[in-house]
Curated annotation (Swiss-Prot):
The lineage of its organism: Bacteria, Pseudomonadati, Pseudomonadota, Gammaproteobacteria, Moraxellales. This is Aldehyde dehydrogenase. One of its GO terms (molecular function) is alcohol dehydrogenase (NADP+) activity. Belongs to the aldehyde dehydrogenase family. GO terms for biological process: alcohol metabolic process. It comes from Moraxella sp. (strain TAE123).
Length: 23
């Protein structure tokens, strides 16, 4: 659940990673 992680949303790299994982 990376997309549910607040730390991932705060980080620009994590933001793109959460989207990459979603797709």
């Amino acid at each position: 659940m990376l997309y549910a992680n607040p730390n991932t949303e705060s980080s620009p790299v994590g933001f793109r990673k959460k989207y990459d994982n979603f797709i």
